[in-house]
């Protein structure tokens, strides 16, 4: 799973959304206090 900082994710949000939707691979976004996961809506609905 790819991991990016929050700043990197913010700078590339639209590209990351496309990448996640096309590859069906989640992306971890690491922050100072917490981490989050960017996941395609289609994959989220399948959970």
Language-model features, listed with the residues they occupy:
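The conserved cystathionine-beta-synthase
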Residues: 6-22
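Short, charge-rich, low-complexity interaction segments located
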Residues: 26-47
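Structural signal for short hydrophobic segments within the conserved structured cores
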Residues: 2-4
């Amino acid at each position: 799973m790819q991991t990016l900082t929050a700043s990197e994710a913010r700078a590339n949000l639209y590209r990351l959304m496309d990448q996640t939707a096309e590859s069906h691979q989640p992306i971890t976004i690491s922050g100072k206090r917490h981490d989050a996961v960017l996941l395609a809506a289609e994959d989220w609905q399948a959970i």
